[in-house]
Amino acid sequence: MRNIQQALEEHKAAVLKKYPEDKLLGVFLYGSQNYGTSTENSDVDTKAILIPSFGDLILREPVSKEIRLANNEHCEVKDIRELVKMFKKQNINFLEILYTDYCWVNPFYKEVWEDTFIKNRDKIVYYDVNKTIQSICGQAINTIKQDPLNGKKISNGFRLYYFLADYTNGKPYRECIKQPQEKLDFLTELKLQESLPDSTKADELLAAFTQIKGLDVTMDDEAKHIHNIAEVSMEIGLRRLIRLYDDFWSIHSDSGRML
């Protein structure tokens, strides 16, 4: 099985061939290893987050690119402004990096990252419950419709269904991401089937997600409070990280290095 820490180092090295290390917040694992459903042949995929300068804010569009490694693994490179947008959209493929056990965080940014985003992650992931429901249902329906007989896609559909059931019941996000072993065994067994005998499971999932997508959860006072704390923490974190990069650049400007 692929060594995750080694993979992170390789992904980091690939990013640093294109971007300077002082702009790199970190490299974070996302995907099946976080969910406990990885297999012997599972790739390691990551997200690398960049910090823009004040000049970047004015002159450049946020970076959003993909690096494909020689072994066909992927590293998605995002400006932190785009990351915050994904957090506010409640995109679980990005939110999960707040909980992964596998990441490299630049020591220069580590304290601010942990003091803002990690410290408030349990509120960020409940920033907008309705957006989470819509995001997951949309992702699940799209995945299932791609191939209703593909075991890997149906396994992913069930994983998202279990996640949503736990999330809407207020479970801690980490528990929503990684299911109990009995469910993991079921998900892995499904995932390993290249073709299912019929579309029964797909039909059941599509019906369930279509029904859930129609729900509208009222934001009560507690939910509004969580939303506001998450909003402020993300904005403060974003500003502090950008200012930190610019302070670093000001101190080292005599190096003559170009951005």
What feature does the model see in each segment?
Residues M1-F28:
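Helical scaffold of the NTase/Pol beta-like nucleotidyltransferase catalytic core
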Residues L50, F87, Y161-T168, Y245:
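Generic structural signal for hydrophobic core residues of well-folded globular domains
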Residues P107-R240:
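Conserved nucleotidyltransferase catalytic core and NTase-mimicking acidic/glycine-rich helix/loop elements
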Residues L57-Q139:
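A basic- and aromatic-enriched beta-loop-alpha substructure that forms the phosphate/nucleotide-
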Residues A230-L259:
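Acidic, carboxylate-rich catalytic segments that either coordinate divalent cations
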